[in-house]
Amino acid sequence: MAVNYSHSDFKRYGPDRAQQNADTIALVVNPVKSDTFAAFQGKIIAQAALSSVDWNYAPNGEDLQVTINGKSGIDPSGTAADTDDIAVAVFDSVGETVYLVQDATDRNITNDAGDTLNIPALVFYIREVTPVV
């Protein structure tokens, strides 16, 4: 089942708030929006540092495409089965705020010696406003 959600601060203040505060990108197994931050942390299976230069903005027609760079060669700290929901998350480890969670391809992830994985980039769009109805 696809898991996609964002924090109310992200919705209210846009990607600038997350870009200024988020310091980590991670692969998470079976995330739930209502998870406490401690529960969320327990679901992280791989993570990497994130900085403001990892955020890219590009016009896309009337919309704005936002891409957050993925990370490669990450040593996993946990495992996932192909039946688990895997998602990419962007969060602030100091402020304990999960800004974005975006569904990723579910697959088996092992944590054997020498295993590495790639955390995919997140891509989303800020849409042009729509007419009043």
Predicted regions span which residues?
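Small cysteine-rich, disulfide-bonded extracellular modules of the LU/uPAR three-finger superfamily
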Residues: 1-86, 93-133
